[in-house]
C-alpha cells in the first residue's frame, strides 16, 4: 500500500540470462520512484528497498542498491504565483488561429474521450469535447487531481522563490510521452505557446524587478515554507555520475 498519487516504475536492465525455471546468478533492475513530496519520497524509497531485501531473503540471494539521480518536488510560492497569474490574464490566452485549430482537431480525433475529460478534470472544469485548443487561462486555485512531472526546477524552488508557467502548446487531451505530443512538437501552435510562455515569464520578471514588495513577500513565503518543511537533497552525498556505465 502507498499513497494514490505515488508511483513506482521499473525496467529490467539485466535479467541474468535466458534459461527458465532457475534463479539467475545476477539481475539488475532500475526503479523510478515518485511522490508528490520529499517526505513521501523518502519513506517510499525505503519501502522499495525493504521489498527488494525481502525478495533476496526469500530467494537466498543478496541485493545492493544505489541512487543514480533524484529531483525534488516543485514548491509553490504564492506571491509569485499570483503575480504570474495576473500577468498571464493581462496577456490573455495563446493567440491560436484557425489553422492551428484545424491541425489540433485532426490530432484530437486520435484521442479518447477519457484523455480529453482528464484534462478538464485536472482543472476542476466540465469537459468540452469540441474544444481543440485551450482558449482560456486556468484558474490559479484548483484542487490537486494527481499526476505530476519531474524537473530539476523543483530543487531550484527549494533554494530560491520560484514560479513556473503552464501554457498550452498542443491539442486538448494530449497525453505526455505520446506520439501525439511528438507529432505536435514543431507545429506552429507549439511555437506560439512557447513564445507566449516566454512573454508571461518576462512580464512576471518585470513586475518582480519593479515591485520590491513582491520580492519581499516572495522571500517571506519561501522562508516560511522552509521553516515548516526543511530541505534535504534527495541525492545522497556519496553519489557520483554513472559515467561510462552501460
Language-model-detected regions and their locations in the chain:
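Short glycine/serine- and small hydrophobic-enriched flexible loop segments
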Residues: 202-210
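Short, flexible loop/turn segments with low-complexity composition
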Residues: 96-104, 213-223
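Zn-dependent metallopeptidase/amidohydrolase metal-coordination segment
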Residues: 109-198, 216-246
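C-terminal domain-closing interface element
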Residues: 32-40, 209, 237-246
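Hydrophobic, well-ordered secondary-structure elements that form the walls
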Residues: 84, 156, 201
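Midchain, well-structured core segments that form catalytic/ion-binding scaffolds
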Residues: 1-114
Amino acid at each position: 500500500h502507498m499513497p494514490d498519487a505515488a508511483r513506482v516504475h521499473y525496467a529490467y536492465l539485466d535479467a541474468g540470462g535466458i534459461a527458465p525455471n532457475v534463479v539467475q546468478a545476477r539481475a539488475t533492475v532500475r526503479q523510478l520512484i515518485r511522490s508528490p513530496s520529499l517526505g513521501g519520497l523518502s519513506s517510499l524509497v525505503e519501502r522499495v528497498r525493504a521489498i527488494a531485501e525481502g525478495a533476496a531473503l526469500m530467494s537466498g540471494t543478496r541485493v545492493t542498491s544505489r541512487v543514480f539521480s533524484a529531483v525534488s518536488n516543485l514548491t509553490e510560492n504564492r506571491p509569485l504565483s499570483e503575480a504570474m497569474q495576473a500577468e498571464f490574464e493581462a496577456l490573455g490566452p495563446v493567440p491560436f488561429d484557425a489553422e492551428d485549430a484545424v491541425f489540433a482537431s485532426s490530432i484530437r480525433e486520435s484521442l479518447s474521450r477519457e484523455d480529453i475529460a482528464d484534462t478538464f478534470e485536472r482543472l476542476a472544469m466540465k469537459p468540452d469535447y469540441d474544444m481543440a485548443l485551450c482558449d482560456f487561462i486556468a484558474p490559479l486555485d484548483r484542487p490537486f487531481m494527481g499526476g505530476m512531472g519531474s524537473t530539476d526546477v523543483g530543487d531550484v524552488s527549494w533554494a530560491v522563490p520560484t514560479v513556473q508557467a503552464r501554457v498550452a502548446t498542443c491539442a486538448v487531451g494530449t497525453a505526455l510521452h505520446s506520439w501525439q505530443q511528438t507529432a505536435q512538437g514543431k507545429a506552429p501552435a507549439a511555437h506560439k505557446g512557447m513564445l507566449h510562455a516566454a512573454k508571461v515569464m518576462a512580464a512576471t520578471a518585470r513586475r518582480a524587478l519593479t515591485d520590491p514588495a513582491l520580492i519581499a513577500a516572495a522571500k517571506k513565503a519561501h522562508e516560511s515554507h522552509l521553516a515548516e518543511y526543511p530541505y534535504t537533497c534527495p541525492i545522497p552525498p556519496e553519489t557520483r555520475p554513472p559515467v561510462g556505465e552501460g
